[in-house]
């Protein structure tokens, strides 16, 4: 005798698996999860206990009655009366509430053909007892099907079914029954009548019949054809058996009288095929993936990762991807099964499917930073470290000049256009103590760079020009510093100028909640001059004092943890990265991983290009030896082995690759309709190459913002390093693609190949020049702006009707001029009546080209004669202008 899973019992009763597990445990059964199995006797006891709330006596007697059940199961047709003794009550109890009189169960489709023939007459007599528990007397038959079907999990479903489905006189439709055997579509139509009766009767039995009606009906249709060779089973455990026990009788009352033996043979053969694995082999041949074994179990709570695709979400819910896609479509989102779902979409879907969702972090397996933090969280070997200072502010306010004076260098003079376009990290020694400075660009395009600088710093110095006051990037710098939660020091620069006004700076910053200490605030304002050096020593003293208050500490003996500030590709060195060490010490020969890049450090360099043996906490330097260019802002961690570093990097790379492949293609229905109506969105395909990763990131972000409803920039490829032949080939394959280079120059060979391929290469060393040129190109692709220019106006004084010519308006010009062939609009009482062209223009009897203000004329309007006195004729022309972003 085979066992039955708790999940199947829960499905048939319509209860959550968790409740059924609890009920089974109350009965003393050793079950813990929904996947545990129990014997048929125990399952029947659970059925009775759930339906009545009373523990069955037979179960209390340690299964003394199950034997009686086993015997009747063996003799299905000859001994129906015996089975009615005790098995009757248990299956029936599930259905008693819904069916006061078992005799009305004519349309019950859940009986086996042969069982229903003999049983119906005897059972009605035994149902004399008034008690609800005695009505189940009819249920014994289901147990017979249980005996036959016990080899598979659904056998238990039959326990709750009736067997008095004999009442209908099926003889009239024998011919239809025969047709049904050969024609599946006809067979389906025969189900309708009995299914309707069944539906009415089943309403009350809702909990007991939770089985998927749709699936079972469709599969029973296939059974009617008796051609099992073509059946493709989605799950051998779930599909066929429950359908035989629930749907066989209803559709074929004629079949019972005409072909009982054939039906019995078919059922037995099908059941036997399960054990032999025949159907399973057939399913493999059809390449049909089996559904989840838990398919019939209602999912109420699931754990899903932060990043999950549509088909993965469907699998978690035991649903088809098409169901999830359909729900999203109804919400106005066009998705494919490989698209990622964001948290909002997950919450909406969870509500739609009535499930509780618990979002978990799926990046733990390659989250080397979390693993590192776990190792050092109780670190006690802490020592003071050098402070990291970030200099921020508006473009051209003197940030780099300040750092140049401190370092005694001339970095600003070497920057293109006199503006910083890279993040630089420098070391300065003051009073025997090291201070690390990060110089960030002030141009608006470098927002991400400034945010990155603020994120790794201990103190922020915001430089404001005394003669210029607070500017947009000044406000942005304040926002970044506040978001990072770091102390702020204000340096009022250019105090050597006559137009310097420090109060202007203080007033502007006070509006941003940055109050100076002399005004009762908590922020230090230091007047300086990067040109003369005035106040710079005071600034450094305040920096060191602030660092002491912060008590900055790190463990120099731990594995290194650093942040990548900038990265690039250098000839002779390969991928290099500028880093700032936050904890631990980085040595030459250490194995490190930074995102998708990993490797063993071949050399360390300081900001002057000199070799180093190690970089301590709070210090900066350049590392050489990574496998590829590390992304700016990535965290770099020292690991023990090359294998560990490679695994982290490869897992992260695979994750990123999969995410790229399934980039969301979501678009609202309204947007989709608009695109179809107005034509395809115009795009400018570009390839971007830059000298360092930070500049590349800034360029991409700036160009992607250059978009509107009509046009956008499509970055088809970007990378760090020079322009290569593959870049030219890619641009050639893409229509109208241009290559944009920043701080790089193509070689003669590349220029020649680009010329042959018809590819345009543009190079720049100032970022806003590049952006302005792209704006101009986009403007040329956009539809021109049509501007209307007024030419003149005339008042109709008299209407003249000329045979074979039409109506002529006798006018006097009140403004400007009226020209022949010009566009005009006829205005009556302030409302435009008609727009057209001047077909004829005469002064007295002469045709003229134009009539000036104050003169009378006759005006004929093309294809329009409804002219009245006191109408106004307004003349204008349309001027097309180039659109700009």
Curated annotation (Swiss-Prot):
One Gene Ontology term, aspect cellular component: cytosol
Binding site for GTP: 393-400, 439-443, 493-496
Region ranges (G3): 439-442
Region (G5): 529-531
GO terms for MF: GTP binding; GTPase activity; translation initiation factor activity
SUPFAM superfamilies named in the record: Initiation factor IF2/eIF5b, domain 3 (SSF52156), P-loop containing nucleoside triphosphate hydrolases (SSF52540), Translation proteins (SSF50447)
Region (G2): 418-422
PROSITE patterns listed in its UniProt record: G_TR_2, IF2
Region Disordered, annotated ranges: 55-150, 269-300
Skewed-composition ranges (Basic and acidic residues): 65-146
HAMAP family (UniProt xref): IF_2_B
Protein name, UniProt field: Translation initiation factor IF-2
Species name: Campylobacter concisus (strain 13826)
